[in-house]
């Protein structure tokens, strides 16, 4: 009768010594008798093969189909060509260690016979399949069971070939090929002793095997061959210790790697039982060569030594759990299975298994993502006055306050209190003297200072927040809203509670290197946290104490008292023994020796007692959790606290529990080198707790609620995610020595709220600044912060408020992210009202300006700032408060009167000029604003406003404009406040008639515009080396003598040649050539009108043209008309192409001349010129207004950068068709019409000096105006300037040529590198082209950009381009140095090189060279490890860029590249500035004393004309506003030295590769 076969269990195998491991193999030619082994041994081997090779989606392993067939006896004369295998193979099927291989022909079954039972292995797979041990499991599982051989002679196995049974497949894909294992199933679990008893039984090979009753056995067709006889084998009895743990899998031992694999012999197959089907690997490993030794000694039979009982208990419990799970899974499988076919799974189960197997392996990057922190949370705050305070003088409140606030979820409770309490004081009438103490408490103090000083230490009231759900427990003030799990619309109660202070001593052992201890006295209350005390101890003792492993411990006093008593008793015994020894010393030496021995024993006892005392102290001490409060542990003044390191014994206890996670924390900081700190955590700890522990251990005490853990699966900062603070560390499957970046996740912004007109905490209505703090992550926009402030401050008109960076004055745009602004610590932002516009008149020159002022500031402060912003300075002697100053046409104006701050005083050089009555009617040209020099004895002037049309000034300069009732856009006049002595002196200076005018000036040129052409004037101009031109008597242009070497020099030797170029000539000769009636030289006219401002003024040129127009009567009529027509055409071209040259005075002269002369001679041409003037002044410039104020003509300033709105044709046509006359009234009507049109146009003023705040546009007040002035004539077809490219609609044909915008990263961008490189280059090009087209030709003259005194006034756009070029260069350096890891820096460098290459393709050479300049900065060039990670592709791109943009040979390669580039182009502005500098410095302005070097201006014109030709063709690109927000303001506060220092921190000098990577 054949014994019953029970399913295998985890049998503890006999484990031989590693040195004696061996296997017995036989040669293929040997015919030995098969010594069969026990069936259960082989089944155990197969069962373990299944258990040691689990199939999972992450590591699929092959499956095997074992089919059970009756075995036949094999004779010893079996000489067929069969392979022999020892039935004692290791690891179930084939030896070989970690991976065993099954070698068989494809689609052929393998039969193995043992003890009368035949096992058929059927494969539908390639010849060799690895038995893979999946990751996460022990690789030494193959050594669990070692086959024990009873005989060294293997048995031959017959090989037959049968077709494999059909295997159910899911689809035709390769993954449907499976390898199945079919075994008997049994729910009964035999004991270990039963299994060993079965090994001793003799198997009957002729009888069929009886399966268990619960197994569904199909009919089996026995093969024709006979089975071999078997020999019983013996097994030793198990030790007694295994009786309890009969179902435990013992630890496995690894097998030696030298054991070769063994082939399996094929046999016939039979019908199968129920099977488990698992997927095959896609690509099997190639078969290794088989080497079978001739003689291998058999393995000895040994049992492993019994493991400790503690480990056995743990293993036993684990094994029971596994068995229960397996039984539950089997029951589920049996209940789910409906039908079986050939032992396979149902189609539904197979489909499910296929889906699981096809899933990719799970990684932290796929399973975890950064948790989105909500940007805001709304909470309802209720305040109830405390009964103890409401009756006294400490707190006064009308009623209970209930208000809804919006907070940042990252803010702590203490920061919430800093928002609520001042808000209640300011808006809700909460009148109390609450102060924020150094202990982060909001204490309410007494109104009476005497009462406050006499109060005891416990007499303190503090504000605290309580959750309405638990009103008796105050909220932890150091925890954030996220940590407290608060939700929207939750109710918090604000109360005042009495503070109870406690003083306790904290012992600090081993305070210094000499192991001296110290004692610190700590003061705390019921709200004080353990962490705050550790922070204070660190700040005080960080030089003496290593805080990285420190904590506060509470010592149990009871155990200490017992230890002390024991020590005292031992000491008394020792003293007694010592006395006895001394007394008996002279009597008996033997007694002395005995006593000494006793003393030694006592001393040893004392030492042991001390050790026990330390151990008891460690065991009795409790480490105080840093998250908790002192009140949680009931700490009082008698508590014994110790501030010490965590002992080694505690570490050993933690390590023995196997619950320690050792992590490497990478500390990231902006201006410090990254440090790595090894910390140990309990995997069950929350991420929030680990973050705060890290903050304390690293000393970054202010970063506890701002930093977080950033986990990167790779070494790239940009591909990681933030760990969720609510989860535990073990949920992330972290391994030991995993790198975590500890860096800033939230930035703490301090908001300064500037509000006036309300009652503050002090009871008055003065303007106050209140501070509140918010924390925001990188995904928070400015609009979120703005809406929070609007809600909390109860603002009804949010359009009147904005946010401004305090340090730079930059206005924050609402659609941008807060982190996109480079706001430096302490991250202060001002929340205040928009400064409103005010129309200011300058009574000296009639200048009128729309300026932005703060209506809440005192008027004297506003006036003091505005007095320095006008284009022409206020004449401090001419502005008077008396109305009797203008009685006569010719007044005596003494600019050096006593008491005034005139220009120079006694030390100034006076230059006196006599003028006739006509000279007093003309106004001076606006000059650079300069404050008069201050003299010690001269009183500084102060100013105020005065309403127009009022005789007496009713405005109080000490109050604000809002308090005076001044409304926005009101017109006021700036007036000087003078004392009585000044007024009296001014009255005495205005009583003489027909007196000479004396003007005292200092470093000021004589204004040639105020003198007629027939008078003698001082002609000054700065030339090379600062010399001044000699005086010249200017004569009428019709009186200019004939050509001679004294007034004209031609480029050729032939004189009077009309076509010859002029090298030098007088001004009259140049104008004669300009208006030559015989021929027209267009190049000469362009050169002259572009460069005339270098040697004359607009007013002088106008007067000379007027002289040329007034032809003498003796000239022929035809010649007269030709000359006049040529003058009219020159004026028309001048107005059309150089309208920015005309100021108020020159425009007035032009209008008067057109109305009085040109409308008579050429009416049609006169109307065209008037229309050009209107088109250029209306909408492009501010309005021209003729208003009488103290007899002066008022007008707006002229050097303004304005955004314009084009006039409609009907308005222009109506003005052009108005009747003209020669009277002054017609001029007034023209100016009035101009005013009426321009009032409706939108103005955006940007002053060149004075006010520090940026220019504010009416539509987008936060963005600076970058609207360039187009050099194109307004009548041309391309009249739309390049600045309107972002605004003007394009035609369908133009839209079709615009490339599609690449929207990568538009959804939720964190930084600039979230966008596509090509799209970044496009947006940079659009912005730079906008700046480039704004350059005026006159900005390149006289090297104005290089002269600080006139640069901001003469060349403002060039300065902007130069500043942006330098900003981009430093910006690139900061972008590369920003990442902490070297691989991320290399990635940033690759992206920047790619952007530079795209800029070159777009012909944006200016920004391309700026980027290359940043890459070649010394702070980047020294980063050898960063550059070493660049691939050859990017190195070649960078090399080509550097070669093309090299400055060698005066930028020869770049000039060739630019010449061959098709527009649109943004050229490198530095090359043009260099060329102009060489021209200016290498050629004088004046030669031969009074001849203008016109050949020099030919060269200048050629350079400027080349610049202008690239301003005409515009880029056809779409604007991406979200990218523009990142590239608009690239200025950083760090200097080159700061960036170089940061580079040294990132990669120190002589740093090793291991230190960087």
Swiss-Prot record:
Coiled coil: 310-338, 591-629
PROSITE patterns hit by this protein: RASGEF (PS00720), RASGEF_CAT (PS50009), RASGEF_NTER (PS50212)
Keyword Coiled coil: yes
GO molecular function: guanyl-nucleotide exchange factor activity
Compositional bias of kind Polar residues: 334-343
Protein keywords: Coiled coil, Guanine-nucleotide releasing factor
Start and end residues of each Ras-GEF domain: 1316-1549
Transmembrane parts of this sequence: none
Alphabetized CDD domains for the sequence: RasGEF, REM
Family annotation (Pfam families): RasGEF, RasGEF_N
GO cellular component: plasma membrane
Region (Disordered): 1-121, 146-181, 195-238, 283-347, 558-619, 881-937, 1254-1303
Lineage: superkingdom: Eukaryota
N-terminal Ras-GEF domain residues: 1058-1177
Biased amino acid composition, Pro residues: 1-16, 283-310
InterPro entries tied to this protein: Ras-like_GEF, Ras-like_Gua-exchang_fac_N, Ras_G-nucl-exch_fac_CS, Ras_GEF_dom_sf, RASGEF_cat_dom, RASGEF_cat_dom_sf
Keyword hit for Cell division: no
Biological process, per Gene Ontology: Ras protein signal transduction
Low complexity composition bias: residue spans: 17-40, 52-63, 73-90, 102-114, 148-161, 195-207, 222-236, 311-333, 558-610, 881-928, 1261-1291
Role description: Promotes the exchange of Ras-bound GDP by GTP.
UniProt protein name: Ras guanine nucleotide exchange factor K
